[in-house]
């Protein structure tokens, strides 16, 4: 990709702040059109692989495909779905999300990111493009602020914050719901607290309520599978 990474982030942030059509919305709309095409032609909504191929070409055509991962900064961590980098200025976390928790199409991914930004605006995601991770998988490039000088939240703090936000625990606290969205994986390693007591939900899994999210999560999550083996 042409241009300096920090310059692209700055430009994308300006577009985001100005309320213009951001990459997240554009990519979501494009993926939805692919879904509609496949459903009309083949009568199925199982089209994740096709969507990823088409999204890569779309990103290349739109100038938001990253060829060089070194632009993201220093490799930081690898989770179940994210390859994580710390930006060169150490102000942002860049996640290459491989769409693991989208089952047969990408609809739930885009719904999830939009829901995250609604509930947790202090650590909202910006989608700045797409790239391949170290395993060669097509990924969304997601940018979050880096939360420095923070500690891990306790289970009680996480519970209290969800109650404050209008959520209730389900399945013995395995996830929280407000009837519109179900939020999984809000455990201490994914929720931080700053020195003023503010909680930051930096990495959760969200599904629209009533769409079988718990089954999808349990089938795809290493954490859930690990619990199942111990029982």
Regions found by a protein language model. Give the residues of each.
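Conserved hydrophobic "DFG−1" position in protein kinase catalytic cores
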Residues: 86-87, 146, 193
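Catalytic activation segment of kinase domains across protein kinase-like and atypical kinase folds
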Residues: 176-231
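Juxta-kinase regulatory segment immediately upstream of eukaryotic protein kinase catalytic domains
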Residues: 1-72
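Active-site ExK catalytic segment of metal-dependent nucleases
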Residues: 93-100, 145-147, 203-205
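Conserved structural core of kinase catalytic domains
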Residues: 98, 114-173
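Protein kinase-like catalytic core scaffold
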Residues: 92, 140-142, 182, 200
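Active-site-adjacent loop/helix micro-motif of nuclease/hydrolase catalytic cores
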Residues: 101-111, 152-157, 210-213
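ATP-binding glycine-rich loop module of kinase domains
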Residues: 45-48, 69-122
């Amino acid at each position: 990709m042409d241009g300096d990474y920090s310059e692209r982030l700055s430009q994308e942030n300006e577009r985001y702040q100005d309320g213009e059509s951001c990459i997240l919305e554009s990519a979501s709309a494009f993926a939805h059109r692919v879904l509609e095409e496949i459903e009309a032609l083949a009568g199925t909504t199982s089209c994740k692989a096709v969507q990823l191929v088409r999204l890569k070409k779309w990103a290349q055509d739109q100038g938001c495909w990253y060829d060089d991962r070194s632009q993201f900064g220093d490799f930081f961590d690898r989770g179940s779905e994210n390859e994580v980098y710390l930006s060169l200025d150490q102000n942002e976390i860049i996640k290459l999300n491989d769409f693991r928790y989208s089952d047969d199409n990408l609809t739930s991914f885009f719904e999830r990111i939009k829901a995250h930004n609604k509930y947790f605006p202090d650590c909202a995601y910006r989608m700045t493009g797409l790239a391949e991770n170290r395993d060669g998988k097509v990924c969304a490039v997601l940018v979050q602020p880096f939360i420095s000088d923070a500690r891990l939240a306790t289970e009680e703090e996480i519970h209290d914050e969800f109650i404050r936000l209008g959520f209730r625990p389900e399945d013995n606290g395995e996830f929280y719901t407000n009837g519109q969205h179900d939020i999984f994986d809000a455990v201490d390693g994914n929720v931080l607290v700053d020195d003023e007591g503010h909680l930051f939900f930096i990495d959760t899994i969200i599904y629209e309520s009533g769409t079988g999210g718990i089954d999808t999560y349990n089938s795809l999550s290493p954490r859930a599978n690990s619990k199942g083996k111990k029982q």
